[in-house]
Amino acid sequence: MTGHCLCGAITYRVDVEPMITANCHCRDCQRQTGTAFSVLVAVPRASLHIDGDIATHTTVGTDTHLNVRRQFCSNCGSPIVSLPDMTPDLAFIKAGTLDDTTMLVPEMDVWCDSAMTWVAMDDEARGQWARGVPLEF
């Protein structure tokens, strides 16, 4: 998989297939993306190779109270990846930055307790976690 930011200053590649794709409804993802949820693609951190001047903003997760490093393009501000301390071996790529999204189908919704009330979730199609993320996929 490959991807890039809006201006093209950041490019990345991943050497493996995604482990899982999820819609994250936590308040921090809502604030970072400026929308109802973030579509995240989980990959092993060691498989993610980023080129360009990536900036990092570290916050304490509102729900987890653990650090989350959010990396973004220092030029255009596009969010690229989240690196939560809660899952130290995983990187969560922002799906909108992928060059090819045709293979993506979200398999779960996480932090559903924080979902905006108007977001429709299909109980039958995906797993749902009210609070948190399953640590084993």
Regions found by a protein language model. Name each.
Residues 1-137:
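A short Gly-Trp-Pro
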